[in-house]
Amino acid sequence: MSLLQPRKVKWRKPQKGRTKGKATRRNQVDFGEYGLQALEPGRLTSRQIEAARIAIVREAKKGAKVWIRVFPHKPVTKKPAETRMGKGKGDLDHYEAIVKPGHILFELAGVPEEVAAEAFRKAGHKLPIKTRLVKSVE
């Protein structure tokens, strides 16, 4: 299983930050016919993204094209278990993608709408945020 992670990061241990507002970019279906859109803000780990991708691919079967529109670029640190507070920030644990409401997470083409709806429904169960199916505006 190849988990997504950046080759290089500008900062090894960045601050957490917070998510404000709605997505102004990556909020329309650009490549496929159907998209999975986030309805609330959140952070997706590379494991969650991979689990959702596998669910989509299994449901869509052959002839389908899947695009992943999110990438986990933010490093997340974690201190070891049973460690007292202080003594600096913890070591790198995993990477997360920051998602705003309206962000398109996955796109799908080459399948009927019912198949896409079921694939995205299963993928949505793997994610910690609410999602919905959107169609291309072409």
UniProtKB/Swiss-Prot annotation:
GO MF annotations in UniProt: rRNA binding; structural constituent of ribosome; tRNA binding
GO-annotated cellular components: cytosolic large ribosomal subunit
Ranges where the record places region Disordered: 1-29
Signal peptide limits: none
CDD domains in the cross-refs: Ribosomal_L16_L10e
Keyword field: Ribonucleoprotein, Ribosomal protein, RNA-binding, rRNA-binding, tRNA-binding
Superkingdom to which the source organism belongs: Bacteria
Pfam families: Ribosomal_L16 (PF00252)
Biased composition (Basic residues): 7-25
Assigned protein family: Belongs to the universal ribosomal protein uL16 family.
Quaternary data: Part of the 50S ribosomal subunit.
Primary role: Binds 23S rRNA and is also seen to make contacts with the A and possibly P site tRNAs.
UniProt protein name: Large ribosomal subunit protein uL16
Organism field: Sulfurihydrogenibium sp. (strain YO3AOP1)
Gene this protein is translated from: rplP
